[in-house]
Regions:
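N-terminal secretory/targeting leader peptides
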Residues: 2-154, 179-410
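Short, solvent-exposed loop/beta-turn-alpha elements that line the ligand-binding surface or hinge
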Residues: 151-174, 205-206
Length: 410
């Protein structure tokens, strides 16, 4: 039973009373601990226990966590690790750090959370690196086309000490943000209702000339333009209607984003192009991190490591068991129930896409941004170094089998 199902058994009036008295975060964390049938009494007791546990010591620091549109329900679809991080950090520090989880776009959204963190409105945030690249453009470094051959290679890079040198340190120095952990998927094209009655896409040329919504990533636009996928910026509020009405043919994003963001009813095919990162990450203000005592900094890093390990395993399971990103699709998954077909591309089609847009095949397309990112990173070759690290493991490694490492220890 999901947290939403558990809370759904409680009236909105009673739930409002609980959240008003104990706070949203305590209520969410408590609901996640309950099993079986949940009554108002059992939930109230769990919330009270959770609240007392969280506040048994006077917190030295309260971290305001702007979690964009995430909540207890959709974090069981796309396993971004936000609540696991918050729960573990509070327990690990025995209440010295308290995390105030603010989701449902209540304080910031996918495009604004990064700036709200930089301005000090929130202390940390969760959003995709691609949507955050507007306020922190160094995050574009993850988005070179076909730099990562698999989800396993993405996780391997994030665990590697090389990620500290190539990604985390330059990002922190330039934007004042500490990159903590991230989920990992690869983006494809999510086709709307205009492809509902068409055969499942098997060739890249079937997508040529389609008009597709693009996120905030500049490098993603380069790849889409090179593949004749016509990237167009469309406000999120207009994207679902655009896919439904056929005003746009598709949108570039990843599988679990389709599921958690309620896109599944208007998506007909999930075309698995795997052409660049889909990374729902959590970062915090470097200024806030640096202001904390050493043992609390250590705790934040250890909780980040725990969250990263959790995300690696949980999201891989959720892709199959919850989202339906598999062949065959399991009954009861979101894709199966909404008739979203998985369009897997053969190796020949992926190679064609690489020939059209990858850095190795079309280096001139990437020169300007590559030079810019290399300069921000102190003169290193960002693409070559990340691609090399990503290929340190066999290409057929399963994402759940990547060995976790504490990246900051070298």
């Amino acid at each position: 039973m999901s947290v939403l199902d558990k809370l759904g058994a409680i009236s909105r009036r009673d739930l409002f009373k609980l959240t008003s008295q104990y706070g949203i975060t305590s209520t969410i964390l408590a609901a996640g601990t309950l099993g079986g049938t949940v009554t108002l009494t059992s939930l109230a007791n769990a919330v009270e226990t959770t609240y007392k546990k969280r506040y048994k010591n006077q917190p030295k620091h309260t971290l305001k966590f702007g979690a964009a549109g995430f909540n207890q329900r959709n974090l069981l679809i796309e396993r971004a690790g936000c609540l696991e991080f918050a729960r573990d950090l509070e327990e690990r520090t025995e209440g010295e750090i308290l995390v105030e989880f603010i989701g449902d776009n209540a304080i910031c959204g996918q495009l604004s959370c990064v700036e709200k963190t930089q301005l000090g409105v929130v202390d940390m945030y969760a959003a995709s690196t691609q949507n955050s690249a507007g306020g922190a453009p160094y995050l574009n470094v993850l988005d070179y086309a076909y730099m990562f051959p698999s989800r396993a290679s993405q996780y391997h890079f994030l665990y590697s000490p090389e990620s500290q040198r190539i990604l985390r340190d330059p990002h922190e120095k330039r934007h004042g943000l500490k990159f903590l952990f991230s989920h990992c998927e690869l983006r494809g094209i999510q086709l709307g209702q205009s492809f509902k009655d068409k055969p499942t896409v098997t060739k890249l040329e079937e997508l040529f000339g389609t008009k597709n919504r693009v996120t905030g990533t500049q490098l993603g636009r380069i790849a889409m333009t090179a593949m004749n996928l016509n990237p167009v910026p469309v406000a999120w509020s207009e994207t679902l209607d655009g896919l439904k009405q056929g005003l746009i043919d598709g949108a570039e994003t990843w599988a679990s984003a389709v599921a958690y963001a309620n896109m599944s009813p208007v998506v007909s095919q999930c075309v698995d192009l795997k052409f660049f990162c889909g990374t729902e990450h959590t970062s915090m203000s470097a200024k806030v991190f640096d202001s904390m005592e050493g043992h609390l900094q250590d705790a934040i890093m250890e909780s980040s490591y725990l969250a990263q390990v959790h995300v690696q395993a949980a999201n891989e399971a959720a892709l199959v068991n919850t989202v339906g990103f598999s062949t065959p699709q399991l009954d009861g998954t979101i894709f199966k129930e909404n008739d979203v077909r998985l369009a897997s591309m053969g190796e020949d089609q992926i190679n064609l896409a690489k020939e059209m847009c990858s850095v190795d095949s079309q280096p001139k397309l990437w020169e300007q941004w590559r030079e810019r990112l290399n300069g921000w990173a102190g003169g290193i070759d960002t693409y070559t170094d990340i691609a090399k690290t990503a290929r340190e493991i066999p290409e057929d490694t399963l994402a759940e089998n990547v060995e976790p490492r504490r990246w900051w220890r070298g």
